[in-house]
C-alpha cells in the first residue's frame, strides 16, 4: 500500500510575488493548500527601539521607512501623537496640506498595489500604466521635500515648509530635443498646486483605463471572484482595517469616524464591498483612487484661496525661519537647541491613528518627561492582515494563494518594524 503524504513547499522569501521578504511554509494536497504558515522577521530593524533612543524630531524619518509605500501617512500618525501630548494645534493651512498629501500618498500606494497585483496575476500593461501616473506624484513629493520617497515633510506643529510657487523643470540635453522637453514641461509652468490640479483633471480617465483592462476582464474575474472570501464577522475578529475591512462590507474609515486634519471639511464617500473576496477588495481600492482625487481637488481649491502660516509660531517646538535665525541671537539659540537636544514632552501616554492606505496605522507613545519617548509602539495594519492568511487561503489552489496575498497589500517594512 502506497502511503500518501502532504507536500510541504517553501514560498519565498526570494519569490517575486512574496511582496518583500515573506516566507510561507505551505502544506499542499496536490495543488490545494491545506495549511499556510507565514514566517516574518526578515526585515526587522528595531524601529521602535531606535525611536526610544533619539529626540522626537529625529525619528520622523524612521516613520517613512516603515510602510515605505505610504510615507507621509506614517509621519502623520507620529507627529499627531506628539501634538496631542504637547497640546498644540497646527494651523488650518497645515491641516489642509497634510490632508492633500495623505491622499496623494493613498493614490501612490494604491497605484503600486494595482500594478503589482495585476503583474502577479499575469496582466503586465496595467503595471506600466500605474507607474506612469506615480512618477507625477513623486514629483510633488520632490517639490516640497527634495526627496521622491522618504519625504520627512510633516513636523510637530505643521509641515516643514509651505508649498512651492514653482515646479522643477526638465532641462534640454543631448538625449531629448526641444519638442520633447516642451511636452514634458507643459504642466510645470506654474506652482505645485497648478501641477497637481492638472493631474487631478486627467487622472479619472487613467482610472477608467485601468478598469477597462481589468474590471470586466474574464481572466481577471476568474482569478479574483469568490477567492479569499472573508465574512464581516471574521474580518472584525481578525482585526482588519482599511480596504480589507471595507471589502467585507463594513463601512469603517477613520477619516469619517474619528476625523483628523481637515477631513471633516471635505466631502467624500466610503466605498464598501459585498462579498469580501479579492474582486471586492480590488473594486474598493479602485474607487478609493477616485475619492482621493476628489479630496485633493477640494484641498487645492481651499489652499489657493487661503494663504497663511504652515506651522505653529513656537520656537520651542518648530525652528525659527532661517532669515530670522541668521540675524537674531535668541532665534539662533532656539534653532541650535531644537536640532541638538530636541524638546521635552509632558509625562503621559497617547494613541494616535490615521487611515493609512492599508488600514489603521497607529502610534502609541509613552512620555516620561524627557526629550525622547519612554516607549513607542507601532500598530501596523498589515500585521493583522497577514495573521489571517492561513484562514483565508485554506482550500484554495496554490495559484489562488498569490492572488489572496496580493489582495492583502502586504509591505514588510511595517510588519517587521
Curated annotation (Swiss-Prot):
It comes from the Bacteria. It catalyses: a quinone + NADH + 5 H(+)(in) = a quinol + NAD(+) + 4 H(+)(out). GO terms for molecular function: NAD binding; NADH:ubiquinone reductase (non-electrogenic) activity; quinone binding. Pfam families: Complex1_49kDa. Gene3D superfamilies: Cytochrome-c3 Hydrogenase, chain B. Keywords: Cell inner membrane, Cell membrane, Membrane, NAD, Quinone, Translocase, Transport, Ubiquinone. InterPro entries: NADH_Q_OxRdtase_suD, NADH_UbQ_OxRdtase_49kDa_CS, NDH1_su_D/H, NiFe-Hase_large. It is a peripheral membrane protein. NDH-1 is composed of 14 different subunits. Subunits NuoB, C, D, E, F, and G constitute the peripheral sector of the complex. NCBIfam families: NuoD (TIGR01962), PRK06075.1 (NF004739). HAMAP family: NDH1_NuoD. NDH-1 shuttles electrons from NADH, via FMN and iron-sulfur (Fe-S) centers, to quinones in the respiratory chain. The immediate electron acceptor for the enzyme in this species is believed to be ubiquinone. Couples the redox reaction to proton translocation (for every two electrons transferred, four hydrogen ions are translocated across the cytoplasmic membrane), and thus conserves the redox energy in a proton gradient. Belongs to the complex I 49 kDa subunit family. This is NADH-quinone oxidoreductase subunit D. It comes from Legionella pneumophila (strain Corby).
Amino acid at each position: 500500500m502506497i502511503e500518501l503524504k502532504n507536500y510541504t513547499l517553501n514560498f519565498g522569501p526570494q519569490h517575486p510575488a512574496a511582496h518583500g521578504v515573506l516566507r510561507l511554509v505551505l502544506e499542499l494536497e496536490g495543488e490545494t493548500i491545506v495549511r499556510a504558515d507565514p514566517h516574518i522577521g526578515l526585515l526587522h530593524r528595531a524601529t521602535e527601539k531606535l525611536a526610544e533612543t533619539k529626540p522626537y524630531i529625529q525619528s520622523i524619518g524612521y516613520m517613512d521607512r516603515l510602510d515605505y509605500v505610504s510615507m507621509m501617512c506614517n509621519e502623520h500618525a507620529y507627529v499627531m501623537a506628539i501634538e496631542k501630548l504637547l497640546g498644540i494645534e497646527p494651523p488650518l493651512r497645515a491641516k489642509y496640506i497634510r490632508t492633500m498629501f495623505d491622499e496623494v500618498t493613498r493614490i501612490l500606494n494604491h497605484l503600486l498595489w494595482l500594478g503589482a497585483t495585476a503583474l502577479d496575476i499575469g496582466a503586465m500593461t496595467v503595471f506600466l500604466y500605474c507607474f506612469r501616473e506615480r512618477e507625477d506624484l513623486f514629483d510633488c513629493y520632490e517639490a516640497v521635500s527634495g526627496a521622491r520617497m522618504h519625504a520627512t515633510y510633516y513636523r510637530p506643529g505643521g509641515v516643514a515648509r509651505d508649498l512651492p510657487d514653482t515646479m522643477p523643470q526638465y532641462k534640454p540635453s543631448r538625449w531629448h530635443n526641444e519638442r520633447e522637453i516642451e511636452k514634458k514641461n507643459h504642466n510645470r509652468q506654474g506652482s505645485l498646486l497648478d501641477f497637481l490640479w492638472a493631474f487631478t483633471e486627467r487622472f479619472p480617465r487613467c482610472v477608467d483605463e485601468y478598469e477597462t483592462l481589468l474590471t470586466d476582464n474574464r481572466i481577471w474575474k476568474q482569478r479574483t471572484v469568490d477567492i479569499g472570501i472573508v465574512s464581516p464577522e471574521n474580518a472584525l475578529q481578525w482585526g482588519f482595517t482599511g480596504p480589507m475591512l471595507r471589502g467585507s462590507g463594513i463601512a469603517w474609515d477613520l477619516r469619517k469616524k474619528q476625523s483628523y486634519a481637515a477631513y471633516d471639511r471635505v466631502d467624500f464617500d466610503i466605498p464598501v464591498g459585498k462579498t469580501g473576496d479579492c474582486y471586492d477588495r480590488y473594486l474598493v481600492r479602485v474607487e478609493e483612487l477616485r475619492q482621493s482625487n476628489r479630496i485633493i481637488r477640494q484641498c487645492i481649491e481651499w489652499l489657493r484661496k487661503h494663504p497663511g502660516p504652515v506651522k505653529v509660531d513656537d520656537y520651542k517646538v518648530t525652528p525659527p525661519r532661517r532669515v530670522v535665525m541668521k540675524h537674531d541671537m535668541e532665534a539662533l539659540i532656539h534653532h541650535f537647541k531644537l536640532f541638538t537636544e530636541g524638546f521635552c514632552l509632558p509625562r503621559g501616554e497617547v494613541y494616535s491613528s490615521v487611515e493609512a492606505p492599508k488600514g489603521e496605522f497607529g502610534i502609541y507613545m509613552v512620555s516620561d518627561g524627557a526629550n525622547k519617548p519612554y516607549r513607542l509602539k507601532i500598530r501596523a495594519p498589515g500585521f493583522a492582515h497577514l495573521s489571517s492568511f492561513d484562514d483565508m487561503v485554506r482550500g484554495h489552489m496554490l495559484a489562488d494563494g498569490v492572488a489572496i496575498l496580493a489582495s492583502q497589500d502586504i509591505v514588510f517594512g511595517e510588519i517587521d518594524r
